[in-house]
A protein has these predicted regions:
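PDZ/PDZ-like peptide-tail recognition elements
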Residues: 26-62, 98, 121
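Short beta-strand/loop motif that positions the catalytic acidic residue
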Residues: 363, 369-371
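Alpha/beta-hydrolase active-site loop
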Residues: 217-238
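N-terminal cap/lid segment of alpha/beta-hydrolase-fold proteins
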Residues: 124-157
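Conserved PDZ fold ligand-binding element
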Residues: 67-90
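Accessory cap/linker subdomain of secreted extracellular hydrolases
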Residues: 271-362
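PDZ-domain C-terminal substructure recognizer with occasional recognition of PDZ-binding tails
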Residues: 26, 30, 79-80, 94-130
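Short, surface-exposed "cap/lid" segments of acyl-processing enzymes
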Residues: 157-159, 163-190
Length: 448
């Protein structure tokens, strides 16, 4: 069995926690959550993360941040947060993010193998600012909880087309994305500069949102979709939004969730980037085959990998067995579950139950499907199949654009293999593929 965990739809595993300060357009009753000003990742990015053999380690201490003020240093190994062991870098980042500004936390570390305990007073997450738009912080209510909503409003008068961003797999905040030079940042920034209203709805328990944690069993795909539906309905009420020209930009697993959204709340069109057209079960088998072959496994071993994965996926997606039970079936099954970035069983199983053909049969809207040829997390065939599905029910409504050299994260790579093994050369630059921004803007402008 190979040591490569399947690369699925997670955009970024290790993200710097912001420390920049700034003003904001407006906010509401949701309290501001905290940041610590650290970038944390496994000690060795080339190896699987493990709290004993490859623990979460501070890579960067941001100037002016709470971590710097408390005396934390690059190279410190994170052992525990408030007496609870730190299992992964993502675990640490998530637990910090659930604290409010002004909270104190105690972090146990190893510094050059010597144990230390450091108390950190957390700072508020900065509000976004823009010279091109007013940033509106508000919320929507869902099942007795509130989801943080971030809206950019053009400074020009009149009604403007709107775009809701739906991100991919995982638990993360989109607050601060506007100025991020990678990921969704350049796309959101370009929309803002071109006088689109943009909206981001945080997932449950992420950013300033309250409600169940994103990893909680109650955090289902259907619940996530209802948050986006509530966001769309709010967006259409603003006097600076043209409610007849509201779009969705969805990435990776996002278009699957979007297929649940558009059957509940109409939109004018959708951009689906780096996604799939078949069921998650079928996709996952081909994903293992594709990536095992990419890293050079003999084809008899590739076949064995796929067969083993089929057993794991059958138990999880077809028989709906709990993730913990499936993980016990073997290391490959455990790897499959880990690749879902902590998402609860029911969330992933609801994704697995989706028939995209059934969903898109009910939604007659224009759709642009984008695929970058250096993305090994999906394939051109998956994207073309999604286009075929949509056009079979609604002729001419879906179109396909292929971008040479673009990876799953919208950056440029020489090949799918380079994307798959990118963490072996963490300092190698991969410039953002600006062509994806141009393609999205062109299509949106043609449809309003």
């Amino acid at each position: 069995m190979n040591n490569l965990r399947p690369c699925v739809f997670a955009l970024s595993l290790y993200t710097a926690i912001s420390t920049t300060s700034g003003a904001f357009g407006q906010t509401n009753e949701l309290p501001r959550h905290a940041v610590i000003g650290l970038q944390v990742a496994p000690a060795n990015l080339d190896k699987p993360e493990d709290p004993v053999t490859n623990p979460a380690t501070i890579k960067v201490v941001a100037a002016g941040g709470a971590g710097e003020a408390a005396g934390l240093q690059a190279g410190d190994v994170l052992v525990a947060l408030d007496d609870m062991p730190v299992t992964t870098a993502g675990d640490f980042a998530h637990r910090i993010s659930r604290h409010l500004a002004g909270d104190s936390v105690t972090i146990r570390i190893l510094r050059q193998r010597a144990p230390m305990s450091i108390t950190v007073m957390l700072k508020p997450r900065p509000y976004e600012t823009s010279s091109d738009a007013e940033i509106v912080y508000t919320s929507v209510s869902l099942n007795g909880a509130y989801r943080r909503v971030i809206i950019t409003r053009p400074k020009t008068s009149g009604r403007h087309p709107g775009v809701l961003l739906i991100g991919g797999l995982g638990c993360y905040s989109l607050d601060g994305e506007l100025t991020r030079p990678a990921g969704y940042g350049p796309i959101v920034s370009a929309l803002v500069k071109n006088a689109f209203v943009t909206m981001r709805v945080e997932k449950t328990g992420e950013g300033d949102s309250n409600g169940p944690a994103c990893t909680d069993p109650k955090a289902t795909a259907e619940l996530e979709a209802r948050g986006y539906v509530a966001g769309l309905r709010l967006l259409k009420t603003y006097d600076f939004v043209d409610p007849t020209h509201v779009f969705i930009f969805a990435h990776s697993l996002g278009p699957l969730v979007a297929s649940l959204v558009v059957t509940q709340e109409p939109v004018h069109g959708l951009v689906a980037a780096e996604t799939i057209g078949r069921s998650w079960y079928e996709y996952s088998l081909e994903n293992v085959r594709r990536q095992s072959a990419l890293i050079g496994e003999p084809f008899d071993q590739v076949d064995a990998e796929v067969r083993a994965h089929a057993i794991c996926a059958s138990h999880f997606f077809l028989q709906h067995e709990p993730a913990d039970d499936v993980s016990k079936l073997g290391e490959q099954c455990a790897d499959m579950i880990r690749s879902y970035a902590g998402m609860p069983s029911l969330y992933m199983q609801q994704i697995g139950d989706l028939s995209l053909a059934k969903q898109w049969k009910s939604a007659d809207i224009p759709v642009l499907v984008i695929y970058g040829t250096s993305d090994p997390a999906t394939s051109a065939d998956e994207s073309r199949y999604l286009v075929e599905i949509i056009n079979s029910f609604h002729p001419g409504r879906a179109s396909y654009v292929e971008l040479p050299g673009m990876g799953h994260d919208f950056a440029r790579y020489d090949s799918q293999l380079e994307f798959l093994t990118r963490r072996k050369e963490p300092n190698k630059p991969h410039p953002y593929d600006d062509e994806v921004v141009a393609v999205v803007l062109k299509w949106l402008n043609e449809h309003f």
